[in-house]
Amino acid sequence: MKIAILSRDGTLYSCKRLREAAIQRGHLVEILDPLSCYMNINPAASSIHYKGRKLPHFDAVIPRIGTAITFYGTAALRQFEMLGSYPLNESVAIARARDKLRSMQLLARQGIDLPVTGIAHSPDDTSDLIDMVGGAPLVVKLVEGTQGIGVVLAETRQAAESVIDAFRGLNAYILVQEYIKEAQGCDIRCLVVGDEVVAAIERRAKEGDFRSNLHRGGAASVASITPQEREIAIKAARTMALDVAGVDILRANRGPLVMEVNASPGLEGIEKTTGIDIAGKMIRWIERHATTEYCLKTGG
């Protein structure tokens, strides 16, 4: 097969591993910067051009689209879909997962347990917003934040009010969430491919922090997950219509709670921690699903 990887930086670990895994299985691979793609949207002869040339047909496309370029990145992916390329995660699913509010609404509607959460835009009644989620301690987030940026633990009501007031000055969407103390600064990242959790790690925040993101200095170890955690991770990925997802789970006294569903999970931390060839599993999923039937279904 001919496979395109959409990424702004082909030197990143995840891109290199996916390219390596695809080549090892006999596929042709090209890494394309989605921002350098430009598109002819024409009912008779749609096409995608890249750095002065018209791109050939790709059997499959692997999107590694960063949050900052979601709009144009998903537009480029959508054009590949229109031309009959199989996407490892469809453009609409990626856009849905990047919208934190919509994601939580969809998960809640499917009965998937979440931390008690409130969301507001520059709330005038800060006190009621805090009461709505059960009071302090609580976590205050900017909806647009990633990798732990724009996330604050407010341990007292006064601190919560101060943080919310500060965020209000940014004219931003504010997410207020109960703090799961018993998780002790840890979460579980489940890597879902299709209908299977192929790997899981426990991420522990560095000392003095409560955010377990590896980008912020957190540590990782292999996690043994329960059948309930496995089920909720797969259900969350399926709810978001993602073939590949990183599902972040908190272990609360009342059971596992989904924190986030990531449409473009990094592979470095979880592959190096578990020793599992996740990139290879993703390529094998493509081999099973980038079929003639898919092209016929999409008009490719």
UniProtKB/Swiss-Prot annotation:
UniProt-listed PROSITE patterns: ATP_GRASP (PS50975)
UniProt keyword Nucleotide-binding present: yes
Domain ATP-grasp: 104-287
UniProt GO cellular component terms: cytoplasm
Protein name: Ribosomal protein bS6--L-glutamate ligase
Family: Belongs to the RimK family.
Pfam families associated with the record: RimK, Rimk_N
Positions bound to Mn(2+) 1: D248, E260
Residues given in the record as Mg(2+) 2 binding sites: E260, N262
Entry's cofactor comment: Binds 2 magnesium or manganese ions per subunit.
Stored NCBIfam families: PRK10446.1, rimK_fam
Binding-site residues, Mg(2+) 1: D248, E260
PANTHER family given in the database record: RIBOSOMAL PROTEIN BS6--L-GLUTAMATE LIGASE, RIBOSOMAL PROTEIN S6 MODIFICATION PROTEIN
Keyword annotations from UniProtKB, A to Z: ATP-binding, Ligase, Magnesium, Manganese, Metal-binding, Nucleotide-binding, Protein biosynthesis
InterPro entries reported for this sequence: ATP-grasp, ATP-grasp_RimK-type, ATP_grasp_subdomain_1, RimK, Rimk_N, Rp_bS6_RimK/Lys_biosynth_LsyX
Described purpose of this protein according to its UniProt entry: An L-glutamate ligase that catalyzes the ATP-dependent post-translational addition of glutamate residues to the C-terminus of ribosomal protein bS6 (RpsF). Is also able to catalyze the synthesis of poly-alpha-glutamate in vitro, via ATP hydrolysis from unprotected glutamate as substrate. The number of glutamate residues added to either RpsF or to poly-alpha-glutamate changes with pH.
GO terms assigned for molecular function: ATP binding; metal ion binding; ribosomal S6-glutamic acid ligase activity
Organism expressing this protein natively: Escherichia coli O139:H28 (strain E24377A / ETEC)
